[in-house]
Design a protein with these regions (language model features):
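Long, charged, low-complexity intrinsically disordered regions
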Residues: 1-119
Length: 119
């Protein structure tokens, strides 16, 4: 599974949550067709300091689609789940946000998640 990771900037153009989710759904479908193993979603953290609307909407949608995702704030070599992701998709090691605790990103594996949401 050492194919490139696709990055999707959902903040581009400052869409509302509904438009961002439409783009997300289309991009996930396209990435799956291309055999892309994982995606990095850039949705921002929001100006309120509590997590933005895009971040919340994206993570809710990913749960509803039963996709396995890893919040950017957990994307660290010190996180056991993140280490499993790095083993499955070695290209993720090249991501500039590894160990950055970036709450404005979410990583997605493009397969249905296992029972309990873990790999």
């Amino acid at each position: 599974m050492d194919r490139p990771v696709r990055e999707l900037n959902l903040e581009l153009g400052r869409p509302d949550a509904a438009e961002a989710l439409r783009r997300l759904a289309a991009e996930v479908e396209a990435a799956r067709k291309m055999g892309t193993p994982a995606m990095k979603l850039v949705h921002g953290y929001g100006s309120s300091g509590k997590g933005g609307r895009l971040r919340t909407a994206c993570r809710t949608w990913l749960r509803q689609q039963e996709l396995c995702f890893l919040p950017g704030e957990e994307f660290s070599i010190f996180n056991q789940e993140a280490r499993r992701w790095l083993a499955l998709c070695p290209r993720l090691r090249q991501d500039r946000d590894l160990d950055a605790e970036n709450r404005g990103d979410t990583f997605v594996l493009l397969e249905k998640r296992k029972k309990g949401g873990k790999l």
